[in-house]
Amino acid sequence: METLLLVQLFHELALKGKNRPFFLKRAKAHVRRALKGLGVALEGEWPMALLFRLPEEAWPEAKARLQDTLGVERFARVHRTPPDLEALKAALEKALEGQAFGSFRITAKRSDKAFPLTSPEIERALGAFVKGKTGAPVRLKGAEREFVVRVLPGAALLEVERHPGPGGLPPGVSGRVVALLSGGIDSPVAAYRLMRRGAEVVLVHFHPFPLLSGASREKAKALAERLARFQHRLRLHLVPFSEVQRHIIVEAPTAYRVVLYRRYMLRIAEAIAREEGALALCTGDSLGQVASQTLENLHAVNQAATLPVFRPLIGWDKEEIVAEAQRIGTYATSILPDEECCTLFAPKHPVTRARLEVVLETEARLPTEELLALALKEREVLTYTWPGKPLPEEPEGAFIMEHGPA
């Protein structure tokens, strides 16, 4: 048995002007890639929506995947009927089987202006039908159940199960960014927020192995695997940082260690960005959350970078960040115990108002170029793909219509 799946794209994609075809093409390719391996076939295509046919047993997995697919506004299982009121009533009657609800509403969207009834007339006729079958009252606001009917040229679609997508732009339409991944709660959320804005994110994790265990590397791998669900193809650079730390510990004032760690991390991330063709860096900083994230310290750290440093969470509080981490599925991994670079030999009383002259004087005593070259040479690069290899080019034979689901 088969089912039909209607996928609607994020509303912002309709506002892209001359670049709109590029954004829509990337969004649709991202949706098709998300559904790879489930036996789906493209039934219909509109500027802002796709209609697929898939096996009934594939629906639960398709639903789970689309809930993580950036660029999707919403999606629904639908029944397709002839563009006829009686056919819609028959489909509604079938959809009502086994359902109970205290209130409902009908929402009609008529793209086919040749259909003899207006959208309000369709809503009234079908609303009276459902009320007669169930006894439930119509409630236009706050209805317990909503049935959406779309009347298209040559067909009508009845949504029987609707779910929200994550929204956002498809990955890669806004360029490439290198994101520093600490293994904590904040940095995976920051990377995700940039993915939602269309950035293709490359992850860089700094680990203290072999000075400490490899636990932080394993956490970074698990987080990268989770984040790959949103981007579908993702690279993770695992950079050994212990040699840099050894030199900083010897030369730097104790209170300045973390500031110097972070400056060297930005330099290494910038070198990776040049290799990757990325135009910006990303961190999970939140202003004032910890000592290293005071305005003075962020200024001192930023001075080491020449690329823009994006901080998507700069105005978020911890509760907001935790809630987002739980929503995107990174929180449980982020709170696992590990030993990360910035906690290694961390000072008991870190500086909160770093003076740039002290930072620069300390760095003048360090073999910066040698340390950067060594860290880059010893790194490991992993690639994650999800849910598999990219799809082939758009299959031929799917019909394309100008007017469709809104």
UniProtKB/Swiss-Prot annotation:
Residues 60-162 form the THUMP domain. ATP binds at L180, L181, H205, F206, R262, G284, Q293. GO terms for molecular function: ATP binding; CCA tRNA nucleotidyltransferase activity; tRNA binding; tRNA-uracil-4 sulfurtransferase activity. Its main location: cytoplasm. InterPro entries: Rossmann-like_a/b/a_fold, ThiI_AANH, ThiI_fer, ThiI_N, THUMP_dom, THUMP_ThiI, tRNA_STrfase, tRNA_sulfurtransferase_ThiI. It catalyses: [ThiI sulfur-carrier protein]-S-sulfanyl-L-cysteine + a uridine in tRNA + 2 reduced [2Fe-2S]-[ferredoxin] + ATP + H(+) = [ThiI sulfur-carrier protein]-L-cysteine + a 4-thiouridine in tRNA + 2 oxidized [2Fe-2S]-[ferredoxin] + AMP + diphosphate; [ThiS sulfur-carrier protein]-C-terminal Gly-Gly-AMP + S-sulfanyl-L-cysteinyl-[cysteine desulfurase] + AH2 = [ThiS sulfur-carrier protein]-C-terminal-Gly-aminoethanethioate + L-cysteinyl-[cysteine desulfurase] + A + AMP + 2 H(+). GO terms for cellular component: cytosol. Transmembrane segments: none annotated. SUPFAM superfamilies: Adenine nucleotide alpha hydrolases-like, THUMP domain-like. GO terms for biological process: thiamine biosynthetic process; thiamine diphosphate biosynthetic process; thiazole biosynthetic process; tRNA 4-thiouridine biosynthesis. Gene3D superfamilies: 3.30.2130.30, HUPs (3.40.50.620). It is found in: Cytoplasm. Its EC number is 2.8.1.4. Keywords: ATP-binding, Cytoplasm, Nucleotide-binding, RNA-binding, Thiamine biosynthesis, Transferase, tRNA-binding. It comes from the Bacteria. Pathway: Cofactor biosynthesis; thiamine diphosphate biosynthesis. Catalyzes the ATP-dependent transfer of a sulfur to tRNA to produce 4-thiouridine in position 8 of tRNAs, which functions as a near-UV photosensor. Also catalyzes the transfer of sulfur to the sulfur carrier protein ThiS, forming ThiS-thiocarboxylate. This is a step in the synthesis of thiazole, in the thiamine biosynthesis pathway. The sulfur is donated as persulfide by IscS. Belongs to the ThiI family. This is Probable tRNA sulfurtransferase. It comes from Thermus thermophilus (strain ATCC 27634 / DSM 579 / HB8).
